[in-house]
């Protein structure tokens, strides 16, 4: 149990960082092609 928990704690920040950078990259690309899409 503790080995699986340690593996999860070591991979979760990596996955979170990768997902956040990918999401930010997608938002930046959308903003480059559609500059007014996020202004309501």
UniProtKB/Swiss-Prot annotation:
Keywords: Chloroplast, Membrane, Photosynthesis, Photosystem I, Plastid, Thylakoid, Transmembrane, Transmembrane helix. The keyword Zinc-finger does not apply. Gene3D superfamilies: Single helix bin (1.20.5.510). It is a single-pass membrane protein. GO terms for biological process: photosynthesis. It is found in: Plastid, Chloroplast thylakoid membrane. It comes from the Eukaryota. One of its GO terms (cellular component) is photosystem I. InterPro entries: PSI_PsaJ (IPR002615), PSI_PsaJ_sf (IPR036062). Its main location: plastid. The chain crosses the membrane at residues 12-34. PANTHER family: PHOTOSYSTEM I REACTION CENTER SUBUNIT IX, PTHR36082. Belongs to the PsaJ family. May help in the organization of the PsaE and PsaF subunits. This is Photosystem I reaction center subunit IX. It comes from Emiliania huxleyi.
């Amino acid at each position: 149990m503790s080995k699986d928990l340690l593996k999860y704690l070591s991979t979760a920040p990596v996955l979170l960082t990768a997902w956040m950078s990918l999401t930010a990259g997608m938002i930046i690309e959308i903003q480059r092609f559609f500059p007014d899409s996020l202004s309501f």
